[in-house]
A protein has these predicted regions:
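A short acidic, glycine-rich active-site loop
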Residues: 67-80
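General small-molecule cofactor/ligand-binding pocket signal
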Residues: 50, 98-102, 155
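Structural beta-alpha unit
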Residues: 1-14, 87-124
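Gly/Ser-rich helix-loop-strand patches that form or flank binding pockets
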Residues: 1-9, 38, 117-158
């Protein structure tokens, strides 16, 4: 677990009122959700869970029906992931979880940052697979991008 906290003007504790956890169905993202739920419970904070569909893969651009099916498939998967997170939250006594799946022409990183900024989120809790070296360079890192550009504190969970 890594915490990247934004500096405050004084030494007072920053209140966490809104927490965002982006998920992609991986075990890393579900682990991040577990941490986010515990923090939300301890801080009595609102919890937002999102899944971003960045773009349609090249092979799906051949027909409108294929594109529609692609989005339906992703939405079904996301709802399944949200269900898991919702169950974890209920088990911790958090009755309400705000969830959203959306497609965006921007990168996943930009979409997460924009979502967090527009909702004045205080903490982003995001899973990281812990890639290093060439794999990280070639594949990029959503978590790293979020850390670099977030307006708020970020908790990385492995």
């Amino acid at each position: 677990m890594t915490i990247v906290a934004k500096a405050t003007d004084n030494n007072t504790k920053t209140q966490i009122r809104k927490i965002l956890v982006p998920i992609d169905g991986s075990e890393c993202s579900l682990n991040a959700a577990r941490y986010a739920i515990k923090i939300a419970k301890d801080e009595n904070a609102d919890l937002f869970c999102i899944h971003v569909i960045a773009s349609v893969p090249y092979g799906y651009t051949s027909s409108p029906s294929a594109i529609d099916q692609y989005f339906k498939d992703i939405e079904e998967k996301a709802q399944s992931w949200f269900g898991k997170v919702r169950d974890m939250a209920k088990n911790e006594g958090i009755p309400e979880l705000k969830t959203e799946t959306f497609a965006d022409v921007k990168s996943v990183i930009e979409s997460i940052i924009d979502y967090a900024t527009s909702r004045d989120v205080d903490l982003i809790v995001i899973g990281t697979r812990g890639r290093t070296g060439l794999k990280r360079f070639l594949m990029g890192s959503v978590a790293n991008g979020v850390v670099q550009h977030a307006h708020c504190s970020v908790l990385l969970v492995r």
